[in-house]
């Protein structure tokens, strides 16, 4: 029995947990938009009910597919909005809509806590399970972001089946009726309720007493279950039409979507049934409807078998049966919606608390993640061209998540069978785990020291870095390009030129222009050629057919633009000598033989590369939607090597090569194992995104480098604090702040990293306090001072200093101008509505489903192709996701180490903000997160008990990744290859980069 002190601590802990659960849901509700279709319905229904009353609500022709049970709550929201003059688009409207479901979610959390305390004891297992329920991705998203009412619908059913667990049948039936009055979806749980009441009759027959009372309970339960439905419908339909109107409403609602699955990522979706008509089917002789009905019969028969077997064995559990049945129906039945899984997940978590079984917890964990991905996918695509999930990437997500959801259900089903029929329990409470490091909440002992660097290891690091650099710099770009432009920005310049031979082609190499043009006239004043010069044309060669006779004087007119070079070629492709031409024809040696990515900009190089040139030459910069530090580095490369393909890409490629030794050092420090660091560095060397993203003159490589550098310094700081204290850890603290500032000044994604760094910074301070060392107050003051100085003041100064090129161009550039730059950046990214054929949502990044197509060389001979795409090594991407999920599972099941928690925090800090972004996004936005996914791979191997086996697995993984790197190298580098090789890389229908 728990002591009075333990009970008080338990109540205090529960209050904190419930406060966190409510706060996070309501904050999400305030700062996110709800699902547009549901929001418009809920607000309109509430306003109509508040204005016209219940009797006039279900008017003819008015769309309202919900039964009356929850409508009074929406009406109350309408009254509050009207009284307080809250607009429909106001965040407070979303707050009000989410308030009741959030409170119901909290009640569900409290129920899990209560059941866990009874069957799991007061240990960490109950706390872990309850905290997972608090931050369950599915319920958080459903209530806080989507703003649905599933929490209010699920709570009475959760209480219903808990009361049935306690053999309190009649109150349970009443609560079932409450849920049925809210949503017809409660009918899915009806067979479980029936089985539970029949089990009561079976108990009476077996005990040979109270049979009549048990049968009476069945009929009483039916009446109590119908009572809330009738009571809720009475104000809306009146006595006369009550039953016919309710029947019509429930029948219409349940039959309103005749599709195999309505965005529910289940078994039917895995078979390709999303939005497929019920008359169609996976096989010519089998329709979706027939398959669904057969599956319902099978699941129901299995329910009866489980119920009978468990009843005979004395392990009859309504909670477990309800979890099995509701999730089973969602998985294998037709006409399922995406949110129907919410109830099932909560029932699984309650069952895990009731039976203290880690397999049930694992099933709930898997189902919550698949359900979250399901909701997030549908939510993020609403209003887009892919709203019905018909694109290749969306179909692949649907199928993969559908298979994953099915696998999670199978785990649930096998566990339910093991518990009900065999009595096999795998307790969660034992998961405090042998060999696992204690969490931050426990007193921390001094960490082991870092292993010394050997000469052999240094040599290996140097060789790997050199090899990476050699491969990265090979065929990076031409080292020659025209450097002397005809500059007509803000004016018009005219140049005459006379070719010595008949011309067949004209090659043009423009420079900076924002709305200029190039026109060429013959001697008679006829326009022979015209090209608009704008943001998309700088530093990129183009060619066109151009017929001009030998000796004919041509006049070129350049208006409001730079043009670096023109070239005329004859029918054989040879350059034609000319007379005149001035700066337009003065660098024939810099004209390339062919046009390719080696001598021309592609993708966002036309923004960032040109801005580096503008900074160097003190021109007004074009690209101002990101901080300037990354473009400062591009400028340095141009200053050293000239405005050439090699010059504008040099700095990024250098940083990409240096990313490999940085990853080596990061994982080495994290694991304290040299072999792990070497493996991490080698894996990153063959990663696709590191290679392709470092060879394009954009800024993501710089932000990613400094984010990883900041993470390295923070890990160093955390390890040092636990041994040397805060005062002995000022060097990593300071260096970490500098790295953080450099990351923020490169791209605002560096700011995302600050959230993860802050959690680690405060977490290790708490761990230091738990060590009970003397003088902690002084350490705390130093940590507070250092945090402000090195993670606020220093980063701000670095960020501000990155704007020095602006000041060089214009000495009057001041604080107000700097602030205007920041507000413009925020406005640009928050209001951007542009679309792109290769944009992708964050959930597709996890499985590398939609590469960014950067470049296509269209001037190659028939039978060959050349292309450049940005994506990840599929081997590393898949392994990284698996290891991230494994680390996450270890943490939520009390089996994780602090190192795993740190990697997860750093990973989540980069990924979570993108989940809230609704504008156009690309796969390369996952680049910083992928660094920690790769670290997770090696960390999981390093934490294995058999180091020899871990090394072998690592080598196999490296070999597989290397094979993929060689295979896909042409698609990463632009190397021209035969069609067969190029086509072989299209391993998914969503790839399409040739």
Feature locations, PLM:
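Transmembrane-helix motifs of polytopic, lipid-linked glycan transferases
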Residues: 95-121, 159, 298-309, 650-671, ...
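Transmembrane helical bundles and short interhelical boundary loops of multi-pass, membrane-embedded
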Residues: 216, 241, 246-262, 287, ...
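Aromatic/glycine/proline-enriched transmembrane-helix motif characteristic
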Residues: 29, 205, 249-331, 417-420, ...
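Transmembrane-helix signature of polytopic, membrane-embedded enzymes
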Residues: 86-92, 107, 112-138, 312-318, ...
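Aromatic-rich transmembrane-lumenal/periplasmic boundary elements in polytopic membrane proteins
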Residues: 26-66, 226-271, 573-612, 796-844, ...
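Membrane-interface transmembrane helices that cradle and orient dolichyl/undecaprenyl
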Residues: 117-124, 152, 158-171, 198-204, ...
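Short acidic/glycine- and proline-prone juxtamembrane loop motifs at membrane-interface regions
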Residues: 144-152, 337, 648, 652, ...
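Perimembrane helix-loop-helix junctions
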Residues: 189-227, 238-239, 343, 713-723, ...
């Amino acid at each position: 029995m728990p002591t009075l002190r333990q009970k008080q601590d338990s109540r205090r802990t529960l209050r904190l947990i419930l406060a966190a659960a409510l706060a996070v849901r309501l904050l999400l509700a305030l700062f996110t938009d709800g699902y547009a279709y549901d929001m418009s319905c809920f607000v309109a229904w509430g306003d109509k009910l508040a204005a016209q009353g219940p009797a006039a609500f279900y008017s003819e022709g008015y769309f309202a597919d919900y039964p009356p049970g929850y409508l009074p709550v929406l009406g109350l929201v309408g009254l509050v909005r009207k009284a307080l003059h809250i607009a429909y688009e106001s965040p407070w409207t979303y707050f009000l809509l989410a308030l009741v479901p959030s409170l119901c979610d909290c009640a569900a959390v409290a129920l899990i806590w209560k059941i866990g305390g009874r069957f799991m004891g007061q240990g960490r297992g109950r706390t872990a399970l309850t905290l997972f329920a608090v931050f369950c991705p599915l319920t958080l998203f459903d209530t806080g972001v989507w703003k649905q009412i599933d929490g209010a619908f699920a709570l009475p059913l959760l209480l219903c089946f808990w009361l049935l667990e306690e053999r309190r049948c009649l109150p349970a039936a009443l609560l079932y009726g409450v849920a049925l009055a809210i949503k017809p979806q409660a009918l899915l749980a009806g067979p479980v309720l029936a089985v539970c009441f029949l089990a009561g009759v079976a108990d009476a027959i077996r005990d040979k007493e109270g049979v009549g009372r048990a049968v009476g309970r069945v009929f009483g339960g039916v009446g109590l279950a119908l009572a809330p439905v009738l009571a809720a419908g009475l104000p809306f339909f009146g006595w006369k039409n009550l039953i016919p109107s309710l029947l019509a409403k429930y029948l219409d609602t349940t039959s309103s979507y005749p599709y195999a699955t309505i965005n529910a990522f289940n078994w039917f979706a895995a078979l390709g049934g999303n939005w497929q008509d019920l008359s169609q089917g996976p096989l010519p002789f089998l329709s979706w409807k027939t398959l669904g009905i057969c599956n319902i019969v099978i699941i129901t028969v299995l329910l009866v078998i489980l119920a009978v077997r468990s009843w005979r064995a004395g392990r009859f559990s309504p909670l477990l049966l309800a979890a099995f049945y509701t999730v089973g129906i969602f998985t294998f039945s037709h006409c399922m919606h995406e949110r129907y899984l919410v109830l099932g997940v909560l029932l699984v978590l309650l069952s895990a608390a009731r039976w203290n079984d880690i397999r049930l917890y694992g099933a709930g964990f898997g189902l919550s993640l698949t359900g979250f991905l399901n909701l997030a996918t549908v939510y993020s695509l609403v209003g887009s061209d892919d709203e019905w999930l018909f694109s290749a990437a969306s179909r692949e997500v649907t199928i993969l998540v559908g298979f994953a959801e099915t696998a999670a259900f199978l785990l649930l089903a096998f566990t339910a069978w093991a518990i009900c029929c065999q009595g096999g329990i795998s307790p969660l409470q034992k998961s405090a785990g042998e060999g696992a490091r204690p969490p931050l909440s426990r007193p921390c002992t001094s960490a082991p020291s870092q292993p010394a660097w050997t000469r052999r290891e240094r040599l290996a690091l140097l060789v790997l870095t050199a090899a990476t650099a050699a491969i990265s710099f090979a065929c990076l770009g031409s080292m020659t390009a025209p450097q002397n432009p005809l500059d007509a920005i803000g004016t018009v310049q005219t140049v005459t030129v006379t070719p010595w031979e008949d011309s067949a082609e004209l090659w043009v190499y423009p420079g900076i222009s924002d709305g200029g043009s190039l026109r060429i006239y013959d001697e008679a004043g006829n326009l022979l050629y015209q090209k608009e010069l704008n943001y998309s044309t700088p530093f990129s060669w183009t060619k066109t057919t151009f017929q001009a006779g030998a000796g004919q004087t041509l006049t070129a007119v350049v208006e409001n633009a730079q043009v670096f070079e023109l070239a005329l070629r004859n029918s054989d492709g040879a350059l034609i000598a000319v007379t005149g031409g001035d700066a337009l024809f003065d660098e024939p040696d810099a004209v390339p033989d062919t046009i390719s990515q080696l001598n021309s900009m592609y993708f966002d190089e036309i923004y960032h590369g040109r801005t580096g040139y503008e900074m160097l030459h003190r021109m007004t910069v074009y690209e101002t939607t990101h901080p300037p530090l990354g473009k400062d580095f591009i400028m340095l490369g141009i200053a050293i090597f000239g405005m050439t393909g090699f010059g504008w890409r040099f700095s990024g490629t250098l940083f990409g090569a240096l990313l490999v030794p940085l990853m080596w050092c990061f994982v080495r420090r994290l694991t304290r194992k040299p072999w792990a660091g070497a493996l991490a560095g080698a894996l990153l060397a063959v990663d696709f995104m590191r290679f392709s993203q470092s060879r394009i003159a954009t800024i993501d490589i710089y932000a990613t480098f400094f984010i990883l550098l900041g993470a390295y310094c923070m890990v160093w700081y955390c390890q040092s604090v636990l041994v040397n204290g805060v005062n002995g850890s000022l060097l990593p603290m300071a260096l970490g702040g500098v790295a953080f500032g450099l990351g923020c000044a490169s791209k605002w994604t560096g700011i995302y990293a600050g959230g993860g760094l802050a959690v680690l910074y405060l977490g290790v301070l708490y761990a230091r306090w738990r060590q009970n060392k003397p003088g902690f107050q002084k350490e705390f003051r130093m940590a507070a001072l250092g945090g402000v100085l090195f993670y606020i003041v220093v980063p701000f100064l670095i960020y501000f200093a990155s704007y020095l090129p602006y000041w060089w161009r214009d000495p009057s550039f001041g604080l107000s101008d700097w602030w205007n730059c920041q507000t413009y950046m925020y406005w640009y990214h928050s209001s951007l509505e542009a679309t792109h054929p290769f944009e992708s949502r964050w959930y597709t990044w996890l499985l590398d489903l939609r590469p960014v197509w950067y470049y296509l060389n269209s001037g190659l001979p028939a039978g060959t192709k050349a292309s450049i795409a940005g994506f990840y090594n599929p081997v590393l991407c898949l392994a990284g996701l698996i290891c991230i999920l494994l680390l996450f599972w270890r943490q939520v099941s009390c089996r994780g180490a602090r190192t795993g928690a740190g990697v997860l925090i750093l990973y989540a800090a980069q990924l979570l903000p993108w989940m809230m972004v609704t504008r156009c996004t690309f796969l390369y936005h996952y680049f910083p997160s992928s660094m920690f996914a790769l670290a997770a791979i090696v960390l999981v191997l390093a934490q294995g008990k058999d180091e020899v086996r871990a090394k072998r697995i690592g080598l196999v993984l490296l070999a597989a990744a290397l094979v993929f790197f060689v295979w896909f190298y042409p698609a990463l580098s632009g190397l021209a290859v035969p069609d067969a090789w190029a086509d072989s890389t299209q391993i998914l229908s969503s790839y399409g980069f040739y």
